[in-house]
Regions:
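Active-site acidic/histidine proton-transfer and metal-coordination neighborhood
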Residues: 2-5, 29, 74-124
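Short, Lys/Arg-rich amphipathic segments at extreme N-termini
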Residues: 9-19, 23-27
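Acidic (Asp/Glu)-rich catalytic clusters
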Residues: 1-8, 26-33, 47-68, 90-100
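Conserved acetyl-CoA-binding loop of GNAT-fold acetyltransferases
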Residues: 36
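Hydrophobic faces of well-ordered beta-strands that scaffold small-molecule active sites
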Residues: 7-15, 39-41, 63-70, 103-105
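Acidic-and-aromatic substrate-binding clefts and catalytic sites of carbohydrate-active enzymes
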Residues: 18-23, 41-53, 73-82, 111-115
Length: 124
């Protein structure tokens, strides 16, 4: 197994893991300072910073985006299904604006008593 204790080139930091230590701009600066070359920011952190400002800070720090967290929750009840789909479309657009390699998805659990092949399972 590779020892990453002193070589951070292969690391990507999921920014939710350090959200209590600082805002997204602080996290970006700390990653650059410590040689971590990629991050995986969360949508709420980007929204709090502003997408244009976050994208510029990431670029200016020389960081890559290994992903963007998160889309998903496709199995919302019927009343929220359209809202969930619209939110996922926005997440895809945001990921593209940031230049993220991927959008991390959490598909969501199936509603109680649903069966394989039901509408919620097909949404996944």
């Amino acid at each position: 197994m590779r020892d990453l204790s002193s070589d951070h080139r292969w690391m990507s930091l999921n920014t939710a893991t350090v959200r209590k230590q600082g805002a997204l701009l602080d996290i970006i600066e700390a990653c650059a300072r410590h040689g971590i070359r990629a991050i995986d920011p969360w949508r709420d952190q980007v929204a709090a910073t502003g997408i244009d400002r976050a994208a510029k800070a990431i670029r200016d720090a020389g960081l890559a985006l290994s992903g963007y967290c998160r889309g998903g929750m496709f199995t919302a009840d019927a009343a929220r299904r359209i809202e969930a789909r619209d939110d996922n479309r926005r997440a895809v657009d945001e990921a593209k604006m940031l230049g993220a390699a991927c959008l991390v998805l959490v598909a969501g659990g199936l509603p109680q008593y649903s069966r394989p092949g039901s509408t919620p399972s097909k949404d996944i």
